[in-house]
């Protein structure tokens, strides 16, 4: 008897990681991504020891280490005068003894690509694009998911990983749209060779 899949709304980092974790436990999974292709928007992302433990469980440390950088330290500076507030050494013997796993930074797209590649290689996972979840109905036997194009998909359960403007969250919790904090963060990725020499340090600041 064919088991109905666990459905995941959203194929970003969270959705892909959830799909891979479930498939490794023997669950059939169907990822429903609203865009027409899988992709990740953003710049860098920090990978702490807790994340590396998860990556090891999923068998992804090799793929991540191929592109990630392990900085020497995490530095906090005063926003007004630039003075160092504290400096935390990383990836030394003491850090390894305390946390067992490393600390690294990588490009968000590289992390996402590694997850999607692993999902594509997993026979229990089906990746669907142009499949935006707009609603769902629970039942004793599972869940029926409504798509924007009018289609309907049956599954054992539904996981909402459809981002900041999540339709699943709005239906389930109904706490309104995200509130704007008034803060703006500017991010960019560029080759280290284009940085001024005095800024070419191997630290997260």
Where are these regions (language model features)?
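Conserved N-terminal helical subregion
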Residues: 1-6, 23, 50-191
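Conserved hydrophobic helix-helix packing surfaces used for dimerization/oligomerization
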Residues: 6-8, 29
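Glycine-rich Rossmann-fold phosphate-binding loop(s) that bind the pyrophosphate
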Residues: 10-12
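N-terminal Rossmann-fold NAD(P) dinucleotide-binding loop
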Residues: 15-16
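Glycine-rich FAD pyrophosphate-binding loop
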Residues: 23-43
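Conserved N-terminal glycine-rich FAD pyrophosphate-binding loop of Rossmann-like flavoproteins
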Residues: 36-56
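Flavin-dependent oxidoreductases
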Residues: 184-205
């Amino acid at each position: 008897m064919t088991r109905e899949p666990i459905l995941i709304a959203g194929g970003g980092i969270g959705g892909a990681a959830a799909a891979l974790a479930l498939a490794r436990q023997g669950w059939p999974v169907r990822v429903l991504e609203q865009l027409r292709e899988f992709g990740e928007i953003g710049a860098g992302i920090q990978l702490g020891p807790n994340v590396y433990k998860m990556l090891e469980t999923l068998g992804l440390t090799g793929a991540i280490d191929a592109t990630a950088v392990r900085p020497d330290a995490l530095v906090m500076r005063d926003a007004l005068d630039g003075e160092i507030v504290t400096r935390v050494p990383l990836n030394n013997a003491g850090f390894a003894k305390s946390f067992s796993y490393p600390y690294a930074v990588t490009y968000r797209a590289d992390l996402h690509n590694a997850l999607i590649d692993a999902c594509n290689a997993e026979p229990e996972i089906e990746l669907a694009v142009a499949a935006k979840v707009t609603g769902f109905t629970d039942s004793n036997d599972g869940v029926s998911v409504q798509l924007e194009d009018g289609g309907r998909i049956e599954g054992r359960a539904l996981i909402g990983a459809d981002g900041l403007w999540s339709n699943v969250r709005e239906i389930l919790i109904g706490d309104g749209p995200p509130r704007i904090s008034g803060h703006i963060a500017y991010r960019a990725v560029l080759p280290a060779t284009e940085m001024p020499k005095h800024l070419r340090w191997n630290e997260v600041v």
